[in-house]
Amino acid sequence: MRHWRRKAMLATLPVIRDKSVRTPWREFWRRFLRQHVAVAAGLFVLLLIAIAFWAQYLMPYDAENYFDYDRLNEGPSSAHWLGVDSLGRDIFSRILMGTRISLAAGIFSVLVGMMIGTTLGLLAGYYEGWADRIIMRICDVLFAFPGILLAIAVVAIMGSGMANVVVAVAIFSIPAFARLVRGNTLVLKQLTYIESARSMGANDWTILFRHILPGSVSSIVVFFSMRIGMSIITAASLSFLGLGAQPPMPEWGAMLNEARSDMVIAPHVAIFPSLAIFLTVLAFNLLGDGLRDALDPKLKS
């Protein structure tokens, strides 16, 4: 009888369920997965990265050394899904291989610019004074030139080639990251936990890279993802002008340059590389918008 009453009493009590702890990482994924457009863009970017890694295994033909002289400038067919160009090369294979070249140029150039610009921004924002004035005046000079003109000037001095294109695009990415990180540093260094770290004897480098830099990571990640699209366009523009990738390298901008003379009789030769550039840049921009809204929901509201 006593056990029956105890069970009845326990049955009336509310059940306390174990709730999962809400971490910043889980909150980020929860907000990001609600944005279907950004998720689709992220999946497309992952697909592009997979293509870039395994392009040589996905190509039906050699991108540089295969020539089908019987089907010059022929449109899409079962043998050549996106057609062939004026030299008989398979456009689909060249676009797949061009994915590796364009993504590498865009990502590595922004990565170099991010590393240098972030370091300069931390130093300028933390120390201020003469260091801030010198770094920001150099950034102002670089900002005075349009990005594409600055890249053209750098490549004209250093010479053509994709390696020099990466350097040129990285140079005009440096001031953008420096100004972004400097603004964050000016705000973060005034917070209480920075003063606490300084009072406990932490040196400047520890404060910069262990306390201030993590507070700027979200802004850097968002800007990094959105900057890649601009870098891909700039690299393609330089290749289109003959200053970047050189034939027979299947870079998207170089493919557009080669297609200029055949656009009337074979428009597909220019349409598909242009579409590849458009979709790639759009995907990175949409992904950047989604990351921004997920990392800082206050901006969205």
From Swiss-Prot:
Residues passing through the membrane, by range: 37-57, 103-123, 141-161, 162-182, 220-240, 264-284
Protein's UniProt keywords contain Cell inner membrane: yes
Superkingdom assignment: Bacteria
Membrane topology term: Multi-pass membrane protein
Pfam assignment, any one: BPD_transp_1
Presence of the UniProt keyword Chloroplast in the record: no
GO cellular component term of the entry, any: plasma membrane
Domain ABC transmembrane type-1: 99-288
Subcellular location: Cell inner membrane
Family designation: Belongs to the binding-protein-dependent transport system permease family.
Oligomeric and partner information: The complex is composed of two ATP-binding proteins (GsiA), two transmembrane proteins (GsiC and GsiD) and a solute-binding protein (GsiB).
Classification via NCBIfam families: PRK15082.1
Protein name per its UniProtKB record: Glutathione transport system permease protein GsiD
Organism annotation: Pectobacterium atrosepticum (strain SCRI 1043 / ATCC BAA-672) (Erwinia carotovora subsp. atroseptica)
Name of the gene: gsiD
